[in-house]
Amino acid sequence: MADPEATKYPLLKLLTYRQTTITDHHKQRPNDDDLQTPQTPPSPLQSCSVQTPPWTIEQHVLQLTAQTSSGLCVVLTLHL
């Protein structure tokens, strides 16, 4: 019988578990200056749109949207 989680979330199969040590983590970490992106001004607080899916992918951008229990809309944008 197939794993229901694998059927429901097929991308989870792409993730693998890898145990790292603290020294490995620090060796692989790129320079913070390389990771910084231009700052955008904060937008006014608004609730998440009910019509917005929890994640979207457009070209090289993955955008995750969630709403906290207090009603704050959190949007995480990853540039791939």
UniProtKB/Swiss-Prot annotation:
Contributes to multiple aspects of the viral life cycle including viral genome amplification, suppression of suprabasal cell differentiation and egress of newly formed virions. Induces host cell cycle arrest at the G2 phase by associating with and preventing the nuclear entry of host CDK1/cyclin B1 complexes. Inhibits cellular DNA replication by preventing loading of host replication licensing proteins MCM2 and MCM7 onto chromatin. Within the cytoplasm, associates with host kinase SRPK1, a splicing factor regulator, and inhibits its activity. The gene is E4. Residues 23-32 have a biased composition (Basic and acidic residues). This is Protein E4. Phosphorylated by host ERK. The phosphorylation triggers a structural change that enhances keratin binding and protein stability. Belongs to the papillomaviridae E4 protein family. It comes from the Viruses. Its main location: host cell. The major E4 form is first synthesized as an E1^E4 fusion protein from spliced E1^E4 transcripts, such that the first few amino acids of the E4 protein are derived from the N terminus of E1. Keywords: Early protein, Host cytoplasm, Host G2/M cell cycle arrest by virus, Host nucleus, Host-virus interaction, Modulation of host cell cycle by virus, Phosphoprotein. Assembles into oligomeric complexes. Interacts with host CDK1. Interacts with host SRPK1; this interaction may favor expression of late viral transcripts. Interacts with host cytokeratin components KRT8 and KRT18. GO terms for biological process: symbiont-mediated arrest of host cell cycle during G2/M transition. It is found in: Host cytoplasm; Host nucleus. Residues 22-50 are annotated as: Disordered. One of its GO terms (cellular component) is host cell nucleus. The keyword Zinc does not apply.
